[in-house]
């Protein structure tokens, strides 16, 4: 029986999950909820379902896999990672995965705060000024390894790919100073299942954010 992934009909926090489902060849169905236009941004599609799914903490995204019902995007990724041995094999690898999971969320929040800001144009130059220092940390953490935890891919690579790709969409040249990050992106996109997924109609690279955002809402 396929699992069900519920989320808004955007990229958002669902992107890394969709990529991981595809990579692991997990049979899944999507419930994509649409949000209405301004000024009301009607959420009734989701609200009509929200308290009918028996979720402990009703929220989007959610994953339903038989009797297992998981919310919180990183918890979903960890759940899938455990099922498919993609959480790191050594203690050092698991530590690196733990660090990346939290670091990516920090990076994601910083970009989201900018893109949802009414002062987007005013704040954008400062964000771009600090971006190389942020990306340098990822570059140094990756080093010469093929994947962020080591020689084998983990669910953390799906998170890092997602957030780096969002930044590349925002500022196309931002990775040019970091050849190892560019190689990582190409390596990830070259994975057989990922490459195939990106050619399908299921692939949803945008909109990155919901309709209230100033950037990434289309």
Curated annotation (Swiss-Prot):
Q: Which reaction does it catalyse?
A: RX + glutathione = an S-substituted glutathione + a halide anion + H(+)
Compartments reported by the entry: Cytoplasm
Q: Check the record and name the InterPro entries matching this protein.
A: Glutathione-S-Trfase_C-like, Glutathione-S-Trfase_C_sf, Glutathione_S-Trfase_N, GST_C, GST_mu, GST_superfamily, Thioredoxin-like_sf
Q: Does the keyword Transferase apply?
A: yes
Per its record, what are the GO molecular function terms? glutathione transferase activity
The UniProt record gives the binding positions of substrate as 116
Give every GST N-terminal domain span: 1-88
Q: In which tissues is it expressed?
A: Expressed in liver, stomach and small intestine. Not expressed in spleen, kidney, colon, heart, muscle, brain or lung.
Residues holding glutathione:
7-8, 46-50, 59-60, 72-73
Supply the enzyme class, top level. Answer: transferase
Q: Which GO terms describe its cellular component?
A: cytoplasm
UniProt keyword list: Cytoplasm, Transferase
Q: How does it assemble?
A: Homodimer.
UniProt xrefs under PANTHER family: GLUTATHIONE S-TRANSFERASE (PTHR11571), GLUTATHIONE S-TRANSFERASE MU 1 (PTHR11571:SF247)
Q: Which family does it belong to?
A: Belongs to the GST superfamily. Mu family.
The record describes the protein's role as: Conjugation of reduced glutathione to a wide number of exogenous and endogenous hydrophobic electrophiles.
Q: What is this protein called?
A: Glutathione S-transferase Mu 6
| Organism per entry | Mus musculus (Mouse)
